[in-house]
């Protein structure tokens, strides 16, 4: 594939989904309190990052695209922190604060670049404001070229089929990063981007390459998708499209320091690429390169357009 300098300055992407605050507590070392067998972890640094759907929006903003995010947060300090983080990187946000809910927060404690434990607050957003969420999507969607639905199974996309139907009526492509064991709710999407683990939970364990190909083609048809992209970590990614042969993109890097957020990077680059006018094959090629960059970083990290172009020019 021909390589060139790319930019996503004209991309307009609406993101809807589960917003999460990712917190990283770093320690240079940890030790055991011998008499109680209790681990002691002195914290040297704390870092907070947009996570979940907010990380998708962050990825789009960092590579130069314009994005707006719609979703829920809690009425708490964590929600304010998340909103401030997104404002800082020029993400337009239209958020609904929910009473008696905490902003979904994940705290990862790391020592010597290894994660020791993850602590989660608030399992799901519990809200009666789904109609308000849908109205906010209606108010915004006509200004965007692509819709991304980022599903972390945290409750925001409870009425996802209604959102898909709305976007289809307006001829706006719908890209979905799925979660869970019910993929039927994603029927009719333009593109679904499960990782191999998520894919196998739906179609069964795949022991051979031809099983992935056969079951991918079948799932594409069953869900009436325009395309299906299965991300496969060190084995790259495989794209299925209607009436086309599957296309495999070998992994651009076999080195992975941390795969956290890599799926967000993939769908963000694809969305920005399609919104700019690149083909789906080009979009997946760029996303594959982008994922190879972020998995070499620790935590929920993004990349910028200069990093992406630098790697492209050395392919």
Swiss-Prot record:
Pfam families: PfkB. Its EC number is 2.7.1.-. GO terms for molecular function: heptose 7-phosphate kinase activity; heptose-1-phosphate adenylyltransferase activity; phosphotransferase activity, alcohol group as acceptor. GO terms for cellular component: cytosol. Keywords: Kinase, Transferase. The keyword Transferase applies. It comes from the Bacteria. Belongs to the carbohydrate kinase PfkB family. PANTHER family: BIFUNCTIONAL PROTEIN HLDE (PTHR46969:SF1). This is Uncharacterized sugar kinase BU060. It comes from Buchnera aphidicola subsp. Acyrthosiphon pisum (strain APS) (Acyrthosiphon pisum symbiotic bacterium).
């Amino acid at each position: 594939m021909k390589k060139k300098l790319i930019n996503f300055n004209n991309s307009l992407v609406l993101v809807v989904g589960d917003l999460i605050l990712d917190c990283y507590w770093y320690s240079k070392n940890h030790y055991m309190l011998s008499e109680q067998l209790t681990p002691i972890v002195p914290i040297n640094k704390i870092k907070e990052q947009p996570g979940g759907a907010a990380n998708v929006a962050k990825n789009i903003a960092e590579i130069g695209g314009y994005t707006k995010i719609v979703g829920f947060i809690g009425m708490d300090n964590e929600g304010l922190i998340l909103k401030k983080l997104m404002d800082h990187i020029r993400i337009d946000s239209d958020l609904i604060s929910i009473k008696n809910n905490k902003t979904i927060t994940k705290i990862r404690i790391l020592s010597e670049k290894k994660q020791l434990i993850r602590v989660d607050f608030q399992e799901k957003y519990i809200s009666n404001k789904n109609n308000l969420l849908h109205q906010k999507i209606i108010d915004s969607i006509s200004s965007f070229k692509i819709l991304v639905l980022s599903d972390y199974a945290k409750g925001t996309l409870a009425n996802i089929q209604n959102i898909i139907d709305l976007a289809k009526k307006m001829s706006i492509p719908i890209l979905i990063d799925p979660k869970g064991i019910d993929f039927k709710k994603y029927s009719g999407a333009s593109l679904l981007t499960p990782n191999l683990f998520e894919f196998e939970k739906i179609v069964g364990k795949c022991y051979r390459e031809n099983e992935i190909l056969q079951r991918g083609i079948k799932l594409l048809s069953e869900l009436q998708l325009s395309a299906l992209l299965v991300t496969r970590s060190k084995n790259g990614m495989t794209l299925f499209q209607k009436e086309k042969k599957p296309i495999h993109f070998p992994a651009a890097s076999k080195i992975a320091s941390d795969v956290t957020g890599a799926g967000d990077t993939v769908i963000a680059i694809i969305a920005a690429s399609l919104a700019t006018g690149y083909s789906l094959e080009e979009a997946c090629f760029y996303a594959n390169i982008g994922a190879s960059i972020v998995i070499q970083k620790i935590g929920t990290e993004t990349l910028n357009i200069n990093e992406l172009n630098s790697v492209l020019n050395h392919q």
